[in-house]
Amino acid sequence: MIPTARCGALRQKIPVQAVRQYSSSTTLKTSPFAPRHLLSIADLTPTEFTTLVRNASSHKHSIKSGSIPTNLQGSLAGKTVAMMFSKRSTRTRISTEGATVQLGGHPMFLGKDDIQLGVNESLYDTAVVVSSMVSAIVARVGKHAEVADLAKHSTVPVINALCDSFHPLQAIADFQTIYETFTPKAHHLSSLGLEGLKIAWVGDANNVLFDMAISAAKMGVDLAVATPKGYEIPASMRELIQEAGKGVANPGKLIQTNVPEEAVKKADILVTDTWVSMGQEEESLKRMKAFEGFQITSELAKRGGANENWKFMHCLPRHPEEVSDEVFYSNRSLVFPEAENRLWAAISALEGFVVNKGKIA
């Protein structure tokens, strides 16, 4: 099994004698011109998250029909979006570059061979210099502290394109997919209209799950998570998820179990992700053994009592041990619309945080 780049990947190892290692200063003050950043769905109110999802869906239908909304036309003209990626990427890179171009901007890709946060110069220096030359930074990094420090010292908006703790762009795309699938076309309420829906996550507790759980709490969607023992959601993350539901009239409930059948009971959507992420190569055999019985199959859905018209989602790349071909390529699968929606989610995020300077109404 080839480990994927989504969760907790380690930075490329560099000989100590070859470079000087720096860490970002904790004594330096935050920029007085601090813009608004998107580091996690926890940074958004329920209304803001709803707006980002709805805008993503609306822009999708407008642009695909050949009508680019007036407020988007050339909205990033003359602006450069720096894409600082220390992890390899397919969907995130393509969607971010495509979104920037759609808005008339110039995407500048800086891979791990071009720039490494905290290597050769401090992260503070990198943040200050890069943000002085571009209009936004989209960062795909290892530790959450890296993107948090980058945002702390940047004078332009920073959008988290993945770290070991969160993946907000994926969450926007996921809920756009759910919204387009489950919300009636005649829906005119202020919410996404997903209250009472149930998602079952079967697999590893990772960054994609964490932002999905925060989103679910804000949207009134119940989320049942089944992981093997020892792979549960960390206590600190559970607290953040619970916090996300505060102030919501009917917040989504978070349920944890070690039994997949319990999670999928009465579920409308079954979701999984990679079992072995980059940085976990040495754990591969251990993880494969631990996750036996956690493959999503039609039989699992039937045994657990998933709702009759249940759907399946996966953020990709997918490996066959995570979900059967029968489910992955069936009419229950939303994986390819979900992948496409990464583009529209990126457009919505750039509009909200760069074009509109964080004013999301």
Swiss-Prot record:
One of its GO terms (molecular function) is ornithine carbamoyltransferase activity. Its EC number is 2.1.3.3. Pathway: Amino-acid biosynthesis; L-arginine biosynthesis; L-arginine from L-ornithine and carbamoyl phosphate: step 1/3. It holds the Pfam family OTCace. L-ornithine binds at residues 207, 273, 277-278. GO terms for biological process: arginine biosynthetic process via ornithine; citrulline biosynthetic process; L-arginine biosynthetic process. Its main location: mitochondrion. The keyword Secreted does not apply. Keywords: Amino-acid biosynthesis, Arginine biosynthesis, Mitochondrion, Transferase, Transit peptide. It catalyses: carbamoyl phosphate + L-ornithine = L-citrulline + phosphate + H(+). It is found in: Mitochondrion matrix. The active site is at 315 (proton acceptor). Carbamoyl phosphate binds at residues 89-92, 140, 167, 170, 315-316, 342. Coiled coil: none annotated. GO terms for cellular component: cytosol; mitochondrial matrix; ornithine carbamoyltransferase inhibitor complex. Residues 1-24 form a transit peptide. Belongs to the aspartate/ornithine carbamoyltransferase superfamily. OTCase family. Homotrimer. This is Ornithine carbamoyltransferase, mitochondrial. It comes from Aspergillus terreus (strain NIH 2624 / FGSC A1156).
